[in-house]
Curated annotation (Swiss-Prot):
Record-level GO BP terms: L-methionine salvage from methylthioadenosine; L-methionine salvage from S-adenosylmethionine; purine deoxyribonucleoside catabolic process
Reaction it catalyzes: S-adenosyl-L-homocysteine + H2O = S-(5-deoxy-D-ribos-5-yl)-L-homocysteine + adenine; S-methyl-5'-thioadenosine + H2O = 5-(methylsulfanyl)-D-ribose + adenine; 5'-deoxyadenosine + H2O = 5-deoxy-D-ribose + adenine
Keyword Iron: no
Organism per entry: Salmonella paratyphi A (strain ATCC 9150 / SARB42)
EC numbers for this chain: 3.2.2.9
Molecular-function GO terms, alphabetical: adenosylhomocysteine nucleosidase activity; methylthioadenosine nucleosidase activity
Keywords from the UniProt entry: Amino-acid biosynthesis, Hydrolase, Methionine biosynthesis
Superkingdom in the source lineage: Bacteria
Annotated metabolic or biological route of this protein: Amino-acid biosynthesis; L-methionine biosynthesis via salvage pathway; S-methyl-5-thio-alpha-D-ribose 1-phosphate from S-methyl-5'-thioadenosine (hydrolase route): step 1/2
Gene label: mtnN
An example Gene Ontology CC term for this record: cytosol
Free-text function comment from the UniProt entry: Catalyzes the irreversible cleavage of the glycosidic bond in both 5'-methylthioadenosine (MTA) and S-adenosylhomocysteine (SAH/AdoHcy) to adenine and the corresponding thioribose, 5'-methylthioribose and S-ribosylhomocysteine, respectively. Also cleaves 5'-deoxyadenosine, a toxic by-product of radical S-adenosylmethionine (SAM) enzymes, into 5-deoxyribose and adenine. Thus, is required for in vivo function of the radical SAM enzymes biotin synthase and lipoic acid synthase, that are inhibited by 5'-deoxyadenosine accumulation.
Record: residues binding substrate: G78, I152, M173, E174
Name of the protein this chain belongs to: 5'-methylthioadenosine/S-adenosylhomocysteine nucleosidase
Enzyme class: hydrolase
């Protein structure tokens, strides 16, 4: 099995990259892909860049060039669920765009023409992630993750997301674009991210402060998940 892993930022991939043996670097379209073995398992780790376009471009390049069997999207996220705090884990059962609106033509809010309203994560990957969470004794929430090209740092943006997606557990800027690409290529995916901030008017301050905490927690989760997927 070859496992594809996608993170947006240097801070979100550096700990995993440093653990890859026999590492080779491929630079394509402004993205970097690091291939090799993570604890004996073949992996391809993509640093995509921030935002939906960068994530979709990177995911497409990763799938075409490295042909992974599954995709794990990792990194940081803003917490929406009331039980989440910095360092906790969110696992997707679905991903949706929070900044797409074609409702004038009868689509659901967040749905693009020709696409489902939401992109469902793979049940087996979700189950494996939840098993890792139990083994590591981490606090985690499973649910809807929403994505858009905005860092949510104010009451207006937050209220809009809560109104349109009351069940959303976390918000970030890449996961749904990656899920969209995986859907088109029929490749199983799951989003496993750590909370770096709680989406509110001070989220930019806590993001800067706690990104390293989120990166450490998400790396631990992904490393454990890769082992479980490879060896059961």
């Amino acid at each position: 099995m070859k496992i594809g892993i996608i993170g947006a930022m240097e801070e979100e991939v550096t700990l995993l990259r440093d653990k890859i043996d026999n590492r080779q670097t491929i630079t394509l379209g402004g993205c970097e892909i690091y291939t090799g073995q993570l604890n004996g398992t073949e992996v391809a780790l993509l640093k995509s860049g921030i935002g939906k376009v960068a994530a979709a471009l990177g995911a497409t390049l990763l799938l075409g060039h490295c042909k992974p069997d599954v995709i794990i999207n990792t990194g940081s996220a803003g917490g929406l669920a009331s039980t989440l705090k910095v360092g906790d884990i969110v696992v997707s059962d679905e991903a949706r765009y929070h900044d797409a609106d074609v409702t004038a033509f009868g689509y659901e809010y967040g749905q693009l023409p020709g696409c489902p309203a939401g992109f469902k994560a793979d049940d087996k990957l979700i189950a494996a992630a939840e098993s890792c969470i139990r083994e590591l004794n981490l606090n985690a929430v499973r649910g809807l993750i929403v994505s858009g090209d905005a860092f949510i740092n104010g009451s207006v943006g937050l209220a809009k997301i809560r109104h349109n997606f009351p069940d959303a557990v976390a918000v970030e800027m890449e996961a749904t674009a990656i899920a969209h690409v995986c859907h088109n290529f029929n490749v199983p995916f799951v989003v496993v991210r750590a909370i770096s901030d709680v989406a509110d008017q001070q989220s930019h301050l806590s993001f800067d402060e706690f990104l390293a905490v989120a990166a450490k927690q998400s790396t631990l989760m992904v490393e454990t998940l890769v082992q479980k997927l490879a060896h059961g």
